[in-house]
A protein has these predicted regions:
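N-terminal beta1-alpha1 cap of cysteine-dependent amidohydrolase-like domains
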Residues: 1-174
Length: 174
């Protein structure tokens, strides 16, 4: 199935497993959540981007989702933090806006996981579908390796009480 919309975020192509979330807010948290590694996220809520994202509320230090699908992407008022689109551009992650996300969600609920591509309009529908079919399935990729910490690090203590703990990181959230 091909859905046409407006390319937003980073002007690049992306491929991944298409999944959806019904969250009305928390877009920065969703995109930076390690559990979304390798996935293109559909937001079922009809509007995204209405507020600025506080970096302290992100789930990790970088965006793990491969792409974003929204019905309507808006620009928030000026203020501290980044807009949703700024976060996507800085992370090199594309979005597609102006599509019927509820219809896409119903399609997803009826079937198995879908390999998906976000591409610009230069590619034919047939070529886009072929690219999606040829992309690796989500479970054939080691996503833990892409989200796990490569080197030990120390988290600074907060408050007077200090403890020593060890965490094995398979994609830990902040």
């Amino acid at each position: 199935m091909v859905h046409r919309g407006l390319l937003r975020g980073a002007p690049v192509a992306a491929e991944g497993e298409l999944i959806f979330t019904t969250a009305a807010t928390g877009w920065g948290e969703i995109l930076t959540d390690p559990s979304y590694a390798g996935q293109i996220v559909v937001l079922t809520h009809p509007m995204a981007g209405s507020y600025r994202i506080d970096p302290a509320e992100l789930e990790s230090t970088r965006v793990h989702a491969r792409g974003l699908v929204v019905s309507r992407l808006v620009t928030p008022p000026r203020g501290p933090g980044r807009s949703l689109e700024e976060l996507l551009i800085e992370a090199g992650v594309p979005a597609i806006a102006g599509v019927d996300t509820r219809a896409i969600t119903l399609e997803l609920r009826r079937g198995a996981a879908r390999r998906t591509v976000i591409r610009d309009g230069e590619q034919s529908d047939r070529a886009a579908v072929a690219a999606a079919r040829q992309s690796p399935s989500w479970d054939s990729v080691d996503h833990v390796a892409s989200v796990a910490t490569l080197r030990p690090f120390t988290v600074p203590a907060v408050g007077a009480r200090r403890i020593r703990a060890v965490l094995v990181d398979f994609g830990v959230k902040r």
